[in-house]
Amino acid sequence: MRLFFALWPDADTRAQIANAAAALRLAGDAQRVPRENYHVTLAFLGEVTTSQLAVLQQIGRGQRAAGCTITFNAYDYWPRHQVAVAIAREAPAALTLLWTQLHRDLVLHQAALNLKRPHSPLRTHITLARKVAQAPVLQAMSPFHWNARSFSLIRSDTSGPRSVYTVVDTWQLLYE
């Protein structure tokens, strides 16, 4: 199974993301991401076995990070990946801490996990469209806020015509 750790939005946040995505002007054959697939990736894990899944769930349970509010305030286009994204120009300290702890624990458990993929830096974004071959007009975005109260382990099924994401497990973030 193909897995990743992510922030997974609640219904209100999903609606805000959908509004931002609808306002983005795309050209050509760009494909908008279905609203049920919106997320912020914390760590892409790739193909994982059942025994590795147990270790990943242990890592998820072990995180002690605070919840936070993320302000998404700009559109961006990444030509190398051919995606249009909503970005947060500044990541909250609590999100950076969660990302750092999660990646530290993935490295600490590397012997049990044997993950092949390198860890990429934190780039707080939500993919809004894929196969964007032509740079969209990046107008100003109406900012929206995501109150991150939990993070999840997500399964990605790419066997059909489009990716289907399923929540495998969720852990609450701490609030004081």
Model-derived segments and their meaning:
Residues 1-176:
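Histidine-dependent nucleotide/RNA phosphoesterase domain, centered on the 2H-phosphoesterase fold
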